[in-house]
Amino acid sequence: MLVSIANTFGRIFWGAVSDKIGRYPTVIAMFGAVAGGLALTALFKGEGSILAILGVMLVALSFGGFLGSFPGITAENWGVANVGTNYGWMFTAYGVAAIAGPQLGARLAQSNNGDYSMAFYIVIGMALLGIVLQLFYISKSKKA
């Protein structure tokens, strides 16, 4: 239930942040929140750990924000004429991740005696890569 609440609130919270600082800096902040949340979860994964729960909620908060931010980003980059179709293609990444992520995480855990930490660290790296790619995109966009 807490994850659902955080996800729902994330759409509103990150939308307000985006209105203040812009879409792309908000995406960077969300990737940072995902990395931080996953780090808390990986480091404090003991049952009932408040910090692990906070980490999961940070990730859920950001997932809601990504879903709220991507339609505007899609329209900005490819126009509004086909935004529904284009957003559908962008959103497909969530579907692929929903299928592949748990399977890959489970395989990593199996090879590490049931410990999911390696899966968390890989996704933290992916979130940090997201920040780098977003910064690269911003720098290229300003030059164009």
Located regions from the model:
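Multi-pass alpha-helical transporter architecture, strongest
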Residues: 124-144
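Cytoplasmic membrane-interface "Motif A"-like loop-to-helix N-cap segments
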Residues: 20-31
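Intracellular juxtamembrane helix-capping segments at the cytosolic ends
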Residues: 65-78
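Paired intracellular helix-loop junctions of major facilitator superfamily
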Residues: 75-83, 113
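Residue-level signature of mid-helix packing/kink "hotspots" within the transmembrane helices
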Residues: 4-12, 95-99
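C-terminal ends and interior cores of transmembrane alpha-helices
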Residues: 32-46
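Interfacial helix-cap and linker-helix signal at transmembrane-aqueous boundaries
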Residues: 17-18, 104-113
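Hydrophobic core of transmembrane alpha-helices in multi-pass small-molecule transporters
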Residues: 51-65
